[in-house]
């Protein structure tokens, strides 16, 4: 039983290690607005564990952004490098941004509500930008909480299933042991009864035959033969219902036994 428990414990540890490796080094999901991502709900999986956001036109600072998985980029030599572009005011802006978490390149309404890059200024635009940033923060927090619960469920369900399997195996082993012990006890009792009945029957037969031979010998010349034996034999016959071949008689005194 201890050996089976140790094997099951080692198996559970290996399963937990495998799940931890899959969760830490597995693929991540990225927000993708390309045409081929429409069928997958505007999401893609990155084997490089990296998402990107970049300008459609690097020469135009007001160009809209595109998002996707880093695996879909044709050129991988300058991946995730701080590529810079200059706008009309002379300030530098990044043309490619990379991140390495689930849906990290999803900015919600930020791309729509944010002012044009570079020349946009003014207090109203700053307020609008701050409001969109707060909305993005709330959306990201909600997404991260859902991801956390999903990962917790992915870890907890196999562990719970493994524990239930271990309990069922232990219960089955216990039931089999108790059933085996009960069958062994019944078999031992049956063998003991057969042994005692066989030997007891033969010993009683031997005692009755010995009593018959002893009572055939006369004790005296003028008294009944073996009155004590007669009483003992009658008691044995009443209990065991065994008939003897010897009939009782009277000793005549002439030296012979007369049968009745």
UniProtKB/Swiss-Prot annotation:
Tissue note: High expression in kidney medulla, placenta and spleen; low in kidney cortex, liver, prostate and gut. Not expressed in normal skin, expression is high in melanocytes and in 3 out of 11 melanoma metastases tested.
Cytoplasmic side: 174-260
Domain of life according to the entry: Eukaryota
Family matches, as Gene3D superfamilies: CD59
Signal peptide: 1-20
Keyword Amino-acid biosynthesis belongs to the record: no
Gene Ontology cellular-component annotations: cytoplasm; plasma membrane
Record's keyword terms, sorted: Glycoprotein, Membrane, Signal, Transmembrane, Transmembrane helix
Pfam families: BAMBI, BAMBI_C
Stored InterPro entries: BAMBI, BAMBI_C, BAMBI_N, Snake_toxin-like_sf
Segments in the Extracellular topological domain: 21-152
Residue stretches spanning the membrane: 153-173
Location of the protein in the cell: Membrane
CDD domains: TFP_LU_ECD_BAMBI
GO terms of molecular function: frizzled binding; type II transforming growth factor beta receptor binding
Glycosylation sites per record: 87
GO process terms (BP): cell migration; negative regulation of BMP signaling pathway; negative regulation of osteoblast differentiation; negative regulation of transforming growth factor beta receptor signaling pathway; positive regulation of canonical Wnt signaling pathway; positive regulation of cell population proliferation; positive regulation of DNA-templated transcription; positive regulation of epithelial to mesenchymal transition
Principal subcellular localisation of the protein: membrane
Topology in membrane: Single-pass type I membrane protein
Known role: Negatively regulates TGF-beta signaling.
Protein family according to the UniProt entry: Belongs to the BAMBI family.
The protein's name in its UniProt record: BMP and activin membrane-bound inhibitor homolog
């Amino acid at each position: 039983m201890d050996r089976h428990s140790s094997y099951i414990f080692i198996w559970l540890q290996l399963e937990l290690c495998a799940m931890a490796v899959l969760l830490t080094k597995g693929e991540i999901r990225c927000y993708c607005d390309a045409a081929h991502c429409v069928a997958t709900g505007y999401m893609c999986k990155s084997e490089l564990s990296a998402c990107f956001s970049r300008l459609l036109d690097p020469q135009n600072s007001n160009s809209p952004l595109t998002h996707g998985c880093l695996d879909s980029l044709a050129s991988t030599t300058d991946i995730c490098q701080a590529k810079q572009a200059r706008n009309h005011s002379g300030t530098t802006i990044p043309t490619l941004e990379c991140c390495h978490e689930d849906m990290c390149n999803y900015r919600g309404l930020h791309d729509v509500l944010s002012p044009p890059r570079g020349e946009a200024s003014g207090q109203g635009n700053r307020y609008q930008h701050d409001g969109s940033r707060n909305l993005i923060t709330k959306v990201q927090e909600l997404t991260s909480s859902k991801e956390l619960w999903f990962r917790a469920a992915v870890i907890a369900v196999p562990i719970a299933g493994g524990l239930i399997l271990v309990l069922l195996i232990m219960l089955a082993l216990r039931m089999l042991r108790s059933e085996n012990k009960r069958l062994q006890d019944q078999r031992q009792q049956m063998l003991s009864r057969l042994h005692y009945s066989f030997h007891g029957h033969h010993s009683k037969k031997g005692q009755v035959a010995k009593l018959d031979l002893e009572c055939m010998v006369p004790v005296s010349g003028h008294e009944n033969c073996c009155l004590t034996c007669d009483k003992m034999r009658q008691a044995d016959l009443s209990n065991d219902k065994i008939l003897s071949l010897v009939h009782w008689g009277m000793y005549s005194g002439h030296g012979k036994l007369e049968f009745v």
